[in-house]
Amino acid sequence: MNSNEIKAILEKIKKKLTNQVNKIKNIFIYIIYLKEYLNQLYEKKYFYREINDENYWKKYSNIEIYINGKKIGTSENINKSEYILLDLFMNGPIKININKKDKIYEITNIRKLRYLMLLYLGIVSKINIVFQQITPPTLNYEKNYKTEEIVDNYFVLHVYVWNEIKK
């Protein structure tokens, strides 16, 4: 083996180790988010979210989540109704009685945590949630809307959400 072959092998090993370290780092970040979330839940009788508070969304600025093609947590032109839709879709109702949270969180938390894990593990590079003619009250009830998830060639997960038409 010559020195160039050894350098190439060492470079491959370095890349693999760097990827593994980044994945572990992302898992720890995910655990910290989860810990903060659980602390908020168990400290209060009711759990409220400040969906219009700028600081609430800034914590998401380092995460590649988009709503209708606009990055959340930044100064892009995301209007109030888009933030409300995003919040209801990812977290459920604004005011939640902790004693009755199980059924609500069964669906919404699994979805939110799954999306965060897909990002943190590098399975997808971005998530773009696209709301198509949705009214906020219907997002409180999972049966009133449908979703379709598509991953494109750039590993962007597009989540399309629309009202289910009742017959």
From Swiss-Prot:
Q: Which domain of life is it from?
A: Eukaryota
The record's annotation in InterPro entries points to: DUF613 (IPR006851)
Q: Which UniProt keywords apply?
A: Plastid
**Subcellular location, record wording:** Plastid
What do the Gene Ontology cellular component annotations say? plastid
An example Pfam family from this entry, by short name, is DUF613
Family statement drawn from the similarity comment of this UniProt entry: Belongs to the A.longa ORF167/ORF288 family.
Q: What is this protein called?
A: Uncharacterized 20.3 kDa protein in rpl12-rps7 intergenic region
Source organism (scientific name): Euglena longa
